[in-house]
From Swiss-Prot:
Gene source species: Caulobacter vibrioides (strain NA1000 / CB15N)
Protein family per UniProt: Belongs to the SfsA family.
Gene: sfsA
CDD domains documented for this protein: SfsA-like_bacterial
Molecular functions (GO terms): DNA binding
Name this protein carries in UniProt: Sugar fermentation stimulation protein homolog
Record Pfam families: SfsA, SfsA_N
Highest taxon in the source lineage: Bacteria
Length: 239
């Protein structure tokens, strides 16, 4: 997927009120950018970190700049939580995810359960429907290990329960973690920061929900879902 061009490099000054980030661009300009990530952003919000923003000339926008990526060590980390669904939609349309290939229709944002919407519903006349939930993952504090979540994620835990209910109805249900970085080979639920989610993921898997984790190929011009990585059930690290 091509990113808004051109991405502009700078350094973070602060991220605040969830959706705002102050930066100093390489040309010395001080800006405030929209931060499309309501989470804790552990490891990718520190003053002085290199960052990449996009610029828009849309007059309806309050902020012309959007924070897209942050540099953590040698890794380029995508922080835009809106991007994974777009990446998955692109991959599904291209039949690029072998575990999710061969469906006749792909419907985004389908209402189900009492008050939930699933990210994608995949259907085929000869198969049970497949309910697909997508989760963004950027968090890594141990070399090679991606973790989710980086804060309490009650809504995500509820999504796992909803997916389990679909399995009980005879449907297929999948949770797909999209890791927006290249430097991770394994994935684990972060039990230290959200034990309820970690337990919920294990319970969902036992109930028949499929867990997929894909890492991205990151660049300042394009990002794409690139390769599947291992879900490590018992890999727990101290905070």
């Amino acid at each position: 997927m091509l990113l808004p061009q051109p991405l502009i490099h700078g350094r973070l000054v602060s991220r605040y009120k969830r959706f705002f980030a102050d930066l100093v661009l390489d040309d010395g300009q001080e800006i405030t950018a929209h931060c499309p990530n309501p989470g804790a952003m552990l490891g990718v919000k520190d003053a002085g970190q290199g960052a990449w923003v996009s610029w828009s000339d849309d007059p309806k926008r309050k902020l012309a700049y959007t924070l897209q990526m942050v540099e953590q060590g040698n890794a380029l980390v995508g922080i835009n939580t809106l991007l994974p669904n777009k990446l998955v939609a692109e991959a599904l349309a291209a039949d690029a995810l072998p575990e999710l290939s061969g469906y006749a229709t792909i419907k985004p944002e389908v209402k189900y359960a009492e008050a939930s919407r699933v990210d994608f519903l995949l259907t085929h006349p000869d198969r049970p429907p497949c309910w697909l939930e997508v989760k963004n993952c950027h968090f890594s504090r141990t070399p090679g290990l991606a973790e989710f979540p980086d804060c309490k994620a009650q809504r995500s835990t509820r999504h796992l329960e909803d997916l389990s209910a679909q399995v009980r109805e005879g449907h297929r249900a999948v949770v797909l973690f999209v890791v927006q970085r290249e430097d991770c080979e394994t994935f684990s639920a972060c039990a230290e920061l959200d034990p309820a989610f970690a337990a919920g993921l294990e319970a969902a898997a036992k109930a028949g929900v499929e867990v997929l984790v894909y890492a991205c190929e990151m660049g300042t011009q394009a990002v794409r879902i690139a390769r599947r990585i291992l879900w490590s059930h018992a890999h727990l690290t101290a905070i």
